């Protein structure tokens, strides 16, 4: 499942941050991507919700510090939906 999540996130991140060659890692955070500001963060989260057909709670969104945190939340939500 993590591979499918990584593929989806890579596509979303490349589109939202306008970086077609961007490679994501679990440790990647807003400090690593020039265009990752607060507005881009919200846009990215909405794209993730739409792509994976999930909904984030405010506290979940506030707790995301890096891509690894995001993957963990997505996995949890997808497992809950099965």
Features from the language model and the residues they span:
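Phosphopantetheine-dependent thiolation modules in NRPS/PKS and related acyl-activating systems
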Residues: 2-36, 40-46, 50-82
């Amino acid at each position: 499942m993590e591979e499918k999540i990584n593929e989806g996130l890579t596509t979303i991140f490349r589109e939202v941050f306008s970086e077609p060659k961007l490679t994501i890692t679990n440790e990647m955070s807003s400090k690593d991507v020039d265009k990752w500001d607060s507005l881009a963060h919200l846009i990215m989260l909405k794209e993730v919700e739409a792509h994976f057909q999930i909904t984030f709670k405010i506290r979940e969104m506030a707790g995301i510090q890096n891509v690894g945190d995001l993957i963990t939340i997505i996995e949890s939500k997808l497992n809950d939906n099965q």
